[in-house]
Amino acid sequence: MKVLASFARRLSLFAVAAVLCVGSFFLSAAPASAQTVAIKMGADNGMLAFEPSTIEIQAGDTVQWVNNKLAPHNVVVEGQPELSHKDLAFSPGETFEATFSEPGTYTYYCEPHRGAGMVGKIVVQ
């Protein structure tokens, strides 16, 4: 009987130690840092499109739009003037950025080329 009680006590101590070790691992894990995701304005094949046209990011991430082809381009985020960049980018490699803090789905477009289908979507988790 003493052997069984001793075994049960050791098993419970081991279980408590395991829970503490695993729990401390999760508490000490570093939070994910914010990322920057690039979107090309003007597809590599010369089409008037954002590349990629749809992205998924986390709240706090930054989107960087890079002027790629067939300038001029800009970015207007529907209903979000603070995230928009209405000035036209003329030079290849010219960039502008916006940080998305709130979860949601954001539709954006290039003002001069919206009619040609230059529209994109950002899904913020």
From Swiss-Prot:
HAMAP family named in the record: Cytb6_f_plastocyanin (MF_00566)
Q: Which positions are tagged coiled coil?
A: none
Checking SUPFAM superfamilies in the record gives: Cupredoxins (SSF49503)
Family membership noted in the UniProt record: Belongs to the plastocyanin family.
A cellular-component GO term for this protein: plasma membrane-derived thylakoid membrane
Q: Which domain of life is it from?
A: Bacteria
Q: How is the cofactor bound?
A: The crystal structure with reduced Cu(1+) has also been determined.
Please state every residue range assigned to the domain named Plastocyanin-like. 35-125
Whichever gene encodes this chain, its name is petE
Q: Which protein, by its recorded name, is this?
A: Plastocyanin
In terms of CDD domains, this protein maps to: Plastocyanin
Annotated membrane topology is: Peripheral membrane protein
